[in-house]
Amino acid sequence: MIKRICFLLSLLMCGVLYAQDITYRTVKDLSYSSSKDPYATERCKLDVYYPENKTGCPVVVWFHGGGLTQGNKSIPGRLKKNGMVVIAVNYRLLPKVAISECLDDAAASVAWAFREVEKYGGDKNKIFISGHSAGGYLTAMVGLDKRWLKKYDIDADSIAGLIPFSGQVISHFSYRKMNGIDNLQPTVDEFAPLFHVRKDAPPLVLITGDRELELSDVMKRMRICGG
């Protein structure tokens, strides 16, 4: 599944699919947070995979899945050798931190991309945010709820596109569990992407299975508000 969706993402990025003759480099474990907290120092790191001696490349910031409770950064194989800069992000995990800190880490890493990606040949006007499962949830929240990036003086509308794969759009199940909410009780509060649907959001591609019925509500609300 993850291979198929990454292949689709590479198609969505358009125009660079056959850039196979380019040399690529990977820089690992760059810190994107100024926090001195030991857990933040451990987890708030990212890897940058980039084509050497190229400029103006599209950029994908990729968040891993794992229910917000596990997982580690990696560069999806199907995103490699496509002429893109790919930034794979680690973030702090529940239950060691609150969900607000997971979201703050996601925003901080995106802000880092806007500040630093040109050093690696990326175009800050072509930054796409993506991720699978929990990573898809973070993608949608950071792009739709503008307060997270505003903290870092970044307008979320500057994101070129949001491409969440199977990300929850109601409040995340791990967050609900931590707060004593029944797993089968759908909740839409300030930690639900659905709560933050807005007309002026970045372009949004929703890729999901047919069991995730709430995704259709996102599209319905986007159409109603004119997004």
Predicted regions mapped to residue ranges:
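Active-site glycine-rich loops that stabilize anionic/oxyanionic intermediates
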Residues: H64-T69, D210
